[in-house]
Amino acid sequence: MIVLPNKVRIFINDRMKKDIYLGISNFGFENDIDEILGIAHLLEHLLISFDSTIFLANASTSRSYMSFWCKSINSATESDAIRTLVSWFFSNGKLKDNFSLSSIRFHIKELENEYYFRNEVFHCMDILTFLSGGDLYNGGRIDMIDNLNIVRDMLVNRMQRISGSNIVIFVKRLGPGTLDFFNQTFGSLPACPEIIPSSIPVSTNGKIVMTPSPFYTVMVKINPTLDNILGILYLYETYHLIDYETIGNQLYLTVSFIDETEYESFLRGEAILQISQCQRINMNYSDDYMMNIYLNFPWLSHDLYDYITRINDDSKSILISLTNEIYTSIINRDIIVIYPNFSKAMCNTRDTQQHPIVVLDATNDGLIKKPYRSIPLMKRLTSNEIFIRYGDASLMDMITLSLSKQDISLKRNAEGIRVKHSFSADDIQAIMESDSFLKYSRSKPAAMYQYIFLSFFASGNSIDDILTNRDSTLEFSKKTKSKILFGRNARYDVTTKSSFVCGIVRGKLLDKTSLVEMMWDLKKKGLIYSMEFTNLLSKNTFYLFTFTIYTDEVYDYLNTNKLFSAKCLVISTKGDVENFSSLKKDVVIRV
């Protein structure tokens, strides 16, 4: 670790796929409480800008931090990627403090699309922020557009809070020129912020929250000490369904269960977690997980790898102490209990956006202060990989699991999805057969539409057959290469439970690079949040899908795009009753 005079921390990570990865601690949407919710997220969208033909890049805003990364591709170099990311924050050597009202307006529209996307695919319920005075969703809404001047002032104010002590930088390589460049830019920031934000309200413990969830989960408040962080790292590397959450200076260990009986036994104090020592902790974490640790605990004074001897040699005492602290918090009700609930009618409170939720007090009734049994945890495997065809009945459940777990990755091709994970076969089966997970998987049907229409366009099966078997979608034809013939109509309107645009497009010069560039152009116009595309077996032919509340505008953009020599687009309007009648005509597509 290299520390600049103003406390900027720089780490060299040659295993990282990104060229540069930058994080800002104490800079997430928890700072929006008592201001306009969404300022942090809006700032993230305003800052990031790049040429998608020579860079891959992204940014994210969480409860307590913001992070940005950039990677060079094609003709660009690592140095180009570093300078591009730095340019998001600095202009002519000075920290950016000016944002145009037109740009703010476009990005607020994009935020509303992101809200729609996340609520269609996920259940966006941030319990900790809600209990601390925020909302269940804190990413920004369209009503911010009514206060553009106030929003702009808040954005400038937020930029002035950036300080060297908040900055963490990962780079693949660090030569003298790059180090000098960092000194001239991020190294010029004050060591402490010029504007000190007000303290975040203390979140409420001893609560039961009933909300959509794939698991029975409890957040256990523990002290944010070095040993407890090392204990969390130990548990995270060894077991599934264990993680942590932070808000302000508070730390919660999150433990999830698939069995309600074990869950309630743990909450009553009847049982403790069965934590066993593994052979060795390697700290082989992803760069995302490492960055999150440094940002959530900015007081860490060493490289995490400096603690690898301690975490292995002292693991027994670290885990015993952590286990005792967990049990004490259970008994003292320093916990937030999350019960899966999918009833739209059950509600006793709402946030300011009128999202319904049930919040109750966690009482001491039935507590047993002497545990007499232990609960085994799901152990991680080194690596596992499966391929699921689009005709497999487990397709949607696997997609739901990957969306709810950050350490599961999936990649689509024309025949199915390839899933990388670290579960045992028995554990993954137990999760997918659990009552709460099945209800969660079925509670958000929007994600299924992407695969219903992918199956329709790529298989030649009728929409009636596909809808009849929508829980498994129909298997694609794999014996022969499909030849897709486009009909006369370019647009077909349907009614579903979601608002989206999808379809197939073909073009002689069409490739993934041009589609990514198209997606970013649509994002800049505020028309979409993201766009998925799958390369079909037919040459230069892709399937596109994007959730959007601006369906006509997106259709007009795609319909007039000169890259497409042929297209067949479906525009879905959200309604209570599905109507696919326009797709039953044989003129749509032939295989």
From Swiss-Prot:
**Cofactor details (free text):** Binds 1 zinc ion.
Q: Which Gene Ontology cellular-component terms appear in the entry?
A: virion component
Q: Which residues form the active site?
A: 44
Tell me the InterPro entries matching this sequence.
Answer: Metalloenz_LuxS/M16 (IPR011249), Peptidase_M44 (IPR005072)
Sorted alphabetically, the Gene Ontology BP terms of this entry are:
proteolysis; viral life cycle
- Chain segments annotated as transmembrane: none
- Chain residues that bind Zn(2+): 41, 45, 112
Q: Which cofactor does it need?
A: Zn(2+)
Keywords, sorted A to Z? Hydrolase, Late protein, Metal-binding, Metalloprotease, Protease, Virion, Zinc
Q: Does the keyword Hydrolase apply?
A: yes
Q: What does this protein do?
A: Probably involved in maturation of some viral proteins by processing them preferentially at Ala-Gly-|-Ser/Thr/Lys motifs. Does not seem to be responsible for the cleavage of major core proteins.
This chain's protein is named Metalloendopeptidase OPG085
